C-alpha cells in the first residue's frame, strides 16, 4: 500500500497521485469479495471467506481500510479500491500499458489538452485536476 495525495475517478478510470508525485492509472472493475481478499492478502491481512460473505462487501472493504489505517483507499498494488465522497466502493485493476499511455488515452477521451513534452508527474497532475 502506498501513501497517496489525490485520487480522481471518471468513467472507467481511477488516477492516483502518490505522496512522492508518482502517478498510476487503474481501470474500474466489478467489486467482488475475491478481489478484496486478494488486496487484503497483498497487504498482509487474512479474513475468513464466510465472514466477508455474511457481513457484505461494503463491510469487508471498510474493515480492510480500517485495519490498514486509511479511511478511503488502498492503492499501489495490482488492484485498488476506493470509497468516494458518496460512500460508493470503486475497485480497479492497474492499467495494462504504461502510465503515460493511459494518461494520453484519458486526455483524448475527455478532450483534455496536453503537451507531449510533459513528464508523467506533470501529465498526471493535469489529468487529476481536469477530472475533479
Model-derived features: positions:
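Extreme N-terminal leader/activation tails
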Residues: 2-12, 35, 40-41
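Acidic, low-complexity, intrinsically disordered interaction modules
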Residues: 17-122
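Short acidic DE-rich linear segments
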Residues: 131-132
Amino acid at each position: 500500500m502506498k501513501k497517496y495525495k489525490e485520487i480522481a475517478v471518471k468513467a472507467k478510470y481511477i488516477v492516483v497521485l502518490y505522496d512522492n508525485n508518482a502517478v498510476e492509472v487503474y481501470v474500474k472493475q466489478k467489486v467482488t469479495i475475491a478481489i478484496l481478499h486478494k488486496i487484503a492478502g497483498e497487504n498482509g491481512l487474512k479474513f475468513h471467506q464466510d465472514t466477508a460473505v455474511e457481513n457484505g462487501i461494503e463491510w469487508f472493504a471498510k474493515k480492510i481500510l480500517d485495519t490498514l489505517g486509511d479511511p478511503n483507499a488502498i492503492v499501489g498494488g495490482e488492484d485498488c479500491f476506493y470509497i468516494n465522497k458518496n460512500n460508493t466502493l470503486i475497485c480497479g485493476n492497474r492499467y495494462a500499458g504504461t502510465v503515460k499511455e493511459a494518461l494520453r488515452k484519458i486526455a483524448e477521451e475527455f478532450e483534455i489538452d496536453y503537451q507531449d513534452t510533459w513528464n508523467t508527474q506533470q501529465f498526471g497532475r493535469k489529468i487529476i485536476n481536469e477530472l475533479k
